[in-house]
UniProtKB/Swiss-Prot annotation:
Belongs to the cytochrome b family. Heme b b566 binds at residues 97, 196. This is Cytochrome b. It comes from Cratogeomys fumosus. Heme b b562 binds at residues 83, 182. GO terms for biological process: mitochondrial electron transport, ubiquinol to cytochrome c. One of its GO terms (molecular function) is metal ion binding.
Length: 379
């Protein structure tokens, strides 16, 4: 008699994906972040569902409904802060996951990588529309500034902005549709994540050495289920520490004031996880140029498979490329800091230099470093 998990139509899919999946024996803790992203997504969908039961997407009552959730709903404050900080946790895992993909050359699985980039875009869109929902000052002005960027598109820009707004300014229609988008997008992300996994399991996982590991693969369960469980426990411990002790650490105090179209906050800025892209946007004086740079700052990831010049896949044995990788990480941290600063000297020039460096490292220095390393190894 066949084991049920190997014969049942549904169980068979789960079995091939999470139990009998052949996995490289040497993948490190950096490979944990894929499963942690799945955990974050489930957490966000569940907390979001409970928040949606009490939230009203109307300009007059949105802010009060969030206050009502925190004050009157049983554990509403916990659900609200878990959802708000869960977004930050999601992006921390996402950026580490992408960083690991760049470091170990996982981008050479083109289909998996491209779906990953699409997932990143959708996650950013979801986080942006979600930030508008509490209808605080930063919600309103963030929505106004970011949607206004579309007006830089020639010919159709202004019409496109008004179409998204559902009027001539950010108002009730905008809030209602943003709530609809924020509700549906996580389910689209879940479906795409499954496709992401499907393509990954076609090729099998990469490993730190960047070499084929078919001869020594081990089953996913119990080795990596245990490892993922440990990662999840550590992550949830850090997460709950943040939620219960420092719930407002990553938020903006301005969002505790109800939206007021007549009063502009002194510094309009997005959440911390968008600051690097916001800094790149601001570093170009031209509006259309800034928008193009903003989009390309993420889209540049799609070029990585075509810019790979090294004969080795991973950066594990390539000190020159490793130095450039960590320079890129440092550059992104600097851009994140600059994005939160006012537009005045010396921040303007630092932002411009950091933006140029960001694109230069990816498009110029890393491909050249790969060629130099090939020469040094006489390949």
């Amino acid at each position: 008699m066949t084991i049920m998990r190997k014969s049942h139509p549904v169980m068979k899919i789960v079995n091939h994906a999470f139990i009998d999946l052949p996995t490289p024996p040497n993948i490190s803790g950096w490979w944990n972040f894929g499963s942690l992203l799945g955990l974050c997504l489930i957490l966000q969908i569940l907390t979001g569902l409970f928040l949606a039961m009490h939230y009203t997407s109307d300009t007059l009552t949105a802010f009060s409904s969030v206050t009502h959730i925190c004050r009157d709903v049983n554990y509403g404050w916990l659900i609200r802060y878990m959802h708000a900080n869960g977004a930050s946790l999601f992006f921390i895992c996402l950026y580490i996951h992408i960083g690991r993909g760049i470091y170990y050359g996982s981008y050479l699985y083109k289909e998996t990588w491209n779906i990953g980039i699409l997932l990143l875009f959708l996650t950013m869109a979801t986080a942006f529309v979600g930030y508008v929902l509490p209808w605080g000052q930063m919600s309103f002005w963030g929505a106004t500034v970011i949607t206004n960027l579309l007006s830089a598109i020639p010919y159709i820009g202004q019409d496109l902005v008004e179409w998204i707004w559902g009027g001539f300014s950010v108002d009730k229609a905008t809030l209602t549709r943003f709530f609809a988008f924020h509700f549906i997008l996580p389910f689209i992300i879940t479906a795409l994540a499954m496709v992401h996994l499907l393509f990954l399991h076609e090729t099998g996982s990469n490993n730190p050495l960047g070499i084929p590991s078919d001869c020594g693969k081990v089953p996913f369960h119990p080795y990596y289920t245990t490892k993922d469980f440990l990662g999840a426990v550590l992550l949830l411990t850090l997460f709950m520490t943040l939620v219960l002790f420092f719930p407002d650490k990553l938020g903006d105090p301005d969002n505790y004031s109800p939206a007021n179209p007549l009063n502009t906050p002194p510094h309009i800025k997005p959440e911390w996880y968008f600051l690097f892209a916001y800094a790149i946007l601001r570093s170009i004086p031209n509006k259309l140029g800034g928008v193009c740079a903003l989009v390309f700052s993420i889209l540049v990831l799609a070029l990585l498979p075509y810019l790979h010049t090294s004969k080795q896949r991973s950066l594990s044995f390539r000190p020159l490329s490793q130095t450039l990788f960590w320079a890129l990480v440092s550059d992104l941290i600097i851009l994140t800091w600059i994005g939160g600063q006012p537009v005045e000297p010396p921040y303007i020039i630092i932002g411009q230099v950091a933006s140029i460096l960001y694109f230069s490292i990816i498009l110029i220095f890393m491909p050249i470093a790969g060629l130099i390393e090939n020469k040094m190894l006489k390949w």
